[in-house]
Amino acid sequence: MDEAIAYMELQDMQHKYLHQLSGGQTQRAYIAMVIAQNTEYILLDEPLNNLDMKHSVQIMKILRKLVTDLNKTIVIVIHDINFASFYSDYIVALKDGAIESEGRTEHIIQSNVLRGIYDMDIEIEEINDNRVCVYYA
């Protein structure tokens, strides 16, 4: 458990109750509980829900580190295509409850594929070797 607490950077608050933690701290505590179980697979449903940008990025970086450092397989349900683009190796895109498209991130984050998933035009820009989906225009 100490390793999981350290991994999630929760040492300063490890003796607090969950209801005393902020939203981001609570999410990290839940993920620490999963890490402590030391399973090969981690399944997370909307781990960024109700988090600000700072904490969302922090969680995604930690999850990516779990894959790299501890060889974990992580499956995440997430609605932000740019988080999926930056942090995923493989994407399964659902539309109306069925798989619309799946494949390595570089194959999914393409305008023609995303048009089929979202029924809208999405421009793709490259920033620091990462594909960013621009769909606000």
Q: How would you name each of these model-derived features?
A:
Residues 57-69:
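Helical segment within the ABC ATPase nucleotide-binding domain
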Residues 42-46:
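Catalytic Walker B motif of ABC-type/P-loop ATPase nucleotide-binding domains
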Residues 102-103:
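ABC ATPase "signature
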Residues 1-13:
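Conserved ABC ATPase "signature" region
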Residues 115-137:
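ABC ATPase nucleotide-binding domains
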